[in-house]
């Protein structure tokens, strides 16, 4: 029995090492491997995640008021974006299966956290009974289930993420039809445009790699990282605005830009014109 147990443990260690091994992921992007550095598989794809690391701390600062008077959960999302960046850097540096899973799961948890906080109640399923805490528990259980499935069948991740991203953009379009603030509407148009450019980069890198490599530019996945971060965080800012407008209108949300409010290509954030008392039991 002891020998069998030891053998089983060795098998587990061997499997874990296989998943950690560089190149163990079935996914390989267009950029050539180990061309710039002998220690980093995809150099450009690795360091093009810089916005995921640099900008969330700024967003945490800008959303300090929002976190105090609307929901502190907004800061969880900004921290999760850092996790996405670090996971993506690890994946592209190693092309390991564990890196791929960490990258995809971090994105999944950003979606679930955002849905928990900002998903409009009018789209809730009936059994949730219009209760955000119940819906948040549903999202948590869904995230745990999807995480388990992803380790069992990694291919599940791609389908889950695609299933969530397209309806999110459709929902953004629907919400934009309801807003009266033209600054918010313009940000929505810019976010959607950047998202479309990001998807264009992803598809071209994945499907037309040979064509882009023929002109010595196999770096579109790196641009995907930059554009998708801009699209993702601006969409999150928009849904943070929609949430207050819909459920806490007395707070009077206002879209602003940093460092100069008049410059609409700065960093957007939500200011609260009528803070009132800090909320205690907000998810």
Swiss-Prot record:
Q: Which UniProt keywords apply?
A: Calcium, Hydrolase, Lipid metabolism, Membrane, Metal-binding, Transmembrane, Transmembrane helix, Zinc
Record GO biological process: brain development; ceramide catabolic process; regulation of lipid metabolic process; sphingolipid metabolic process
Tissue specificity statement from the Swiss-Prot or TrEMBL entry? Expressed in the central midgut of late embryos. In brain, it is present at the interhemispheric junction and in groups of cells in the central brain.
Report the SS bond pairs.
none
Q: How does it sit in the membrane?
A: Multi-pass membrane protein
Q: Does the keyword Transcription regulation apply?
A: no
Q: Which GO MF term does the entry hold, naming one?
A: metal ion binding
Show the Pfam families listed in the entry: Ceramidase
Q: Where in the cell is it found?
A: Membrane
Phenotype of the disrupted gene, per the record: Discrete defect in the ellipsoid body.
- Which residues are noted in the entry as Ca(2+)-binding? 28-29, 31, 33, 42
Q: Which reaction does it catalyse?
A: an N-acylsphing-4-enine + H2O = sphing-4-enine + a fatty acid
* Binding of Zn(2+), residues: 92, 221, 225
Could you say which EC number(s) this protein's record lists? Answer: 3.5.1.23
| Reported cofactor(s) | Zn(2+)
Reply yes or no: does the keyword Signal apply: no
Cellular component annotations (GO), alphabetically ordered: endoplasmic reticulum; membrane
Name where it mostly resides: membrane
Q: Which residues cross the membrane?
A: 43-63, 69-89, 98-118, 134-151, 154-174, 187-209, 222-242
> Known InterPro entries for this protein?
ACER
Q: Into which family does the record put it? A: Belongs to the alkaline ceramidase family.
Known role: Hydrolyzes the sphingolipid ceramide into sphingosine and free fatty acid.
PANTHER family given in the database record: ALKALINE CERAMIDASE
Indicate what this protein is called per its UniProt record.
Answer: Alkaline ceramidase
| Name of the gene encoding the protein in the UniProt record | bwa
